[in-house]
């Protein structure tokens, strides 16, 4: 495995089960990979980005998925979450108004914990709420 000499954070998308295993098994596989990276590159923090399609084999589309992956990571101080706003919207998390955004973030805090939030990939969506499509749009268009 290459050493990330100047990199202190690595952003990773959880990926898909491709129908080959259960989501529960994929949580274990993802956490195992994160644990390996942490052992081999001691200074790196892994940042998991949420995924878009909650109706598929994708892992990381729900706050529950993210929570389950984190639960299996050995060093929880070295794992964080980046929320992609298009992916949130595609997965059915409504963030269109101040109130719905606050409710979504309350759910995130309740299920995952705000302490794990490292960043936000801020963008808009070309698709409808819960449309399960990863179609990024410029903000406001």
Predicted stretch roles:
Residues 51, 82, 86, 123:
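Anionic group-transfer/hydrolysis microenvironments
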